[in-house]
């Protein structure tokens, strides 16, 4: 079979060579493209004749899937698959396997870091020092004793909950299903309305799909109060980000830490959150660490090996 990795996945060429060796040793052809492209024509060209294609979070739209005549399987070095033309994959019986779980610790740690910055004004303090300022007026609060609301208690949400508990926070959660592990940890399940209205810190950790797109609408954002810290390291389109920016500018929401937007960075200059007050914005980096990139690469190659062995793993439901 012909197998192609269409873009870099955050590890060195040496790691790619090591991970691809079991594939080529079985007689399969492996091609690696070390540059990213979002051009559908170039993606189609790179996919030509490939039985298996490996991608990360670059779009792989319907028009590319349509032209990939030999394609049987997509191994995605990412958790979400909303950047792929999944309907066309389903129509063509193309299997998609993802890399769920590779970044749980990495994302959860950034969530904690964002909460600390929002409470202790770390970025603002850095700017003050560099401009001759002092700590006067910085103040700050502790995570300990705060109520943290987790919306979506999957693997990342649960990991974040454990870290918040380690700091001494009380954790409540809204989730589609309830976990015995979470209950054993003392996490209390509440209604969405109660989580939003009673939490000092709200962390959004839902996947993006047809049901969650636009989930956190203006009326739900309004349930949070003027002191609430809102953190989104999940997916941008889950939130009405224009309403989020308005709530911040109107003083109806305390602070927002956002790693994901309605588009991938670079973000257009007129995007509402860029003009919003009391924000910490990061360029979709929550999943990136040295450790998570190595885990991700291994999973995406293991997915290919398992498929070639007739025992596919991490198969996404389409």
Regions flagged by a language model, labelled:
Residues 166-183:
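NAD(P)-binding Rossmann-fold cofactor-contacting core
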Residues 157-158:
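N-terminal Rossmann-fold NAD(P) dinucleotide-binding loop
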Residues 153-154:
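Glycine-rich Rossmann-fold phosphate-binding loop(s) that bind the pyrophosphate
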Residues 62-65, 178-272:
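Rossmann-like adenosine-cofactor binding region
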Residues 1-50, 172:
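N-terminal glycine-/charge-rich "phosphate-binding" loop or analogous flexible N-terminal tail
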Residues 92-94, 100-147, 162, 166, ...:
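Phosphate-binding beta-alpha-beta segment of Rossmann-like dinucleotide-binding domains, i.e.
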Residues 96, 227-229, 233-318:
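Rossmann-like dinucleotide-binding domain for NAD(H)/NADP(H)
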